[in-house]
Amino acid sequence: MSTGGTIHNYYVDSLIGQETEDLYAARYAQGSHSTASRPSGVADSSDFSSCSFTSKSTAFSNPWSPVHPQSSAAVAGIYHPYMHQSHLAAGDTRYVRSWLEPLSSSVSFPGFHPNGRHYGIKPETLSSKRTECSSYELQTLSLPEFTCGSYPECREKLPKELGCTSSETTSNSEHKEEKQQQLDPNHPAINWIHARSTRKKRCPYTKYQTLELEKEFLFNMYLTRDRRYEVARILNLTERQVKIWFQNRRMKMKKMNKVKNNEEP
């Protein structure tokens, strides 16, 4: 227990030292709150009793070597703010991300100090951006002026072409309306001669085809499928045409027989 207590007192005493307090006081002296150095044995609050620590000479024996106090330069190096090293960035630019858009140093973010620099970002003045914007605006303003002022003939041709196209469209629309009136069967002004028949046009057979079909009909009124295929191939007809012709020929023959039977007493 004695060794543990002595080690604990040793670490507390080493942490609460005069050197670190002087450094903290020098660092935050510029702030609004003034910090004063305090003795090592006095606590922060008045509620707690003061702790008394034994001196280093009495607490530790010879085997324990005293701790070397940290130099002010070493401690200051810990809290030293990071500064951008220009020679390193200029020497090796392979690791610089060129796809990031450089921000000017005047841009302030809520998490940064207004007077601090954005480290790792190349500062850029606003003069170059202003010149680029001004040149772009001049180009955009000059283009419509050039196009409008240098081609007066195009302005004159445009209304003429528009007038021609409008007249053509009106004439085409009138022509279409006349055609629709002529083709409309319900229109009262249309003559019955112009009405189109919905019946399909007949496909008359030639004299040679009708002669051969009559011979085949006199030989046999009903054709088999094979014979019908042969007749259609010889006469350059389809099987359906040959079939329909034979059906019509049989109906005609029945009518002729009825007429003969009615005429006979």
UniProtKB/Swiss-Prot annotation:
The taxonomy runs:
Eukaryota, Metazoa, Chordata, Craniata, Vertebrata
* Localization, UniProt: Nucleus
Q: Which gene name does the record give? A: HOXD9
Q: Which SUPFAM superfamilies match?
A: Homeodomain-like (SSF46689)
Gene3D superfamilies documented for this protein: Homeodomain-like (1.10.10.60)
Concerning PANTHER family, the annotation shows: AGAP004664-PA, HOMEOBOX PROTEIN HOX-D9
Record's SMART domains? Answer: HOX
State the similarity comment: Belongs to the Abd-B homeobox family.
Q: Which residues bind DNA?
A: 198-257
Keywords from UniProt, A to Z, are: Developmental protein, DNA-binding, Homeobox, Nucleus, Transcription, Transcription regulation
Query: Cross-referenced Pfam families, in alphabetical order?
Result: Homeodomain, Hox9_act
Where is the major localization of this protein?
nucleus
Presence of the UniProt keyword rRNA-binding in the record: no
Question: What does the record give under GO molecular function?
Answer: DNA-binding transcription factor activity, RNA polymerase II-specific; RNA polymerase II cis-regulatory region sequence-specific DNA binding
Q: Where is this region: Disordered?
A: 163-188
Q: Which PROSITE patterns match?
A: HOMEOBOX_1 (PS00027), HOMEOBOX_2 (PS50071)
Single Gene Ontology BP annotation: anterior/posterior pattern specification
Name this protein carries in UniProt = Homeobox protein Hox-D9
What's a single GO CC term here?
Answer: nucleus
